[in-house]
Amino acid sequence: MSRDLIKKYCVCVEGVYVKKNKILLMKRCVIPFKGFWHLVGGQVEKNETLKEALKREFKEETNLDVKVGDVVGGRIEETFDRTKIIVTFEVVGAQGEINLNDENSEYGWFAKIPRNSVYDFGKFLQR
């Protein structure tokens, strides 16, 4: 696989964590999507499985140790410089207290998805 192809595509993961019919969302404080709500997630690193990547991202962004369940969705996002292949997993449990890193300014549990969201996560509340 050429380096150009690797630069044009990246695989990302995100986690849907629903508790008491509310979904956990984070508010970005850095570009891209500064000021927008999103699911916890990020890019898969070399030699990492998709589930390992999501566990790492949850730990980095929230300080939570999570149990990752099944794939519940996915999508492709085209940006100006690459294509993101995003795999969405259900998070079926978590331990610890939420402590944000420097990528997010706040978190919230939502029964309705805020208008300023990166993506419409509402379908995950209807499960």
Regions found by a protein language model. Name each.
Residues 1-23:
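Conserved N-terminal beta-strand and adjoining loop/helix that marks the start
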Residues 99-127:
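NUDIX/MutT-family hydrolases
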Residues 64-73:
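A short coil-to-beta-strand element that immediately follows conserved catalytic motifs
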Residues 22-60:
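Conserved Nudix-box catalytic region and its N-terminal flanking loop in Nudix hydrolases
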Residues 17, 88-92, 109-111:
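Short, well-ordered beta-strand micro-motif
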Residues 44, 93-94, 98, 112:
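Hydrophobic pocket-lining residues within nucleotide cofactor-binding pockets
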Residues 75-97:
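Active-site-adjacent beta-strand/loop module that shapes the phosphate/pyrophosphate-binding cleft
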